[in-house]
């Protein structure tokens, strides 16, 4: 199964509380921090809601 590398490219400060919560739950703390998450519907949904704050790369196993 493919995985996604998610990088926070813009700050979550001054954003809606829901968007800040999503950033925190994905494990992103600071600008330019990255996490690797499984490519599933839940992760894709979270990325969709904060797509203007993150960049996503697909990592193939």
From Swiss-Prot:
The entry's keywords: Ribonucleoprotein, Ribosomal protein
Domain of life: Bacteria
An MF annotation (GO) of this entry: structural constituent of ribosome
One Pfam family recorded for the sequence: Ribosomal_L30
Keyword Membrane: no
Disulfide-linked positions: none
InterPro entries: Ribo_uL30_ferredoxin-like_sf, Ribosomal_uL30_bac-type, Ribosomal_uL30_ferredoxin-like
Cellular component terms per the entry's GO annotation: large ribosomal subunit
GO biological process: translation
Keyword Ribonucleoprotein recorded: yes
Subunit structure: Part of the 50S ribosomal subunit.
Protein family according to the UniProt entry: Belongs to the universal ribosomal protein uL30 family.
Protein name listed in UniProt: Large ribosomal subunit protein uL30
Organism of origin: Lacticaseibacillus paracasei (strain ATCC 334 / BCRC 17002 / CCUG 31169 / CIP 107868 / KCTC 3260 / NRRL B-441)
Gene from which this protein is expressed: rpmD
């Amino acid at each position: 199964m493919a995985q996604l590398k998610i990088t926070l490219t813009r700050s979550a400060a001054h954003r809606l509380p829901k968007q800040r919560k999503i950033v925190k739950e994905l494990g992103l703390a600071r600008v330019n921090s990255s996490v690797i998450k499984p490519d599933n519907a839940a992760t894709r949904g979270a990325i969709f809601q904060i797509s203007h704050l993150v960049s996503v790369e697909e990592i193939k196993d």
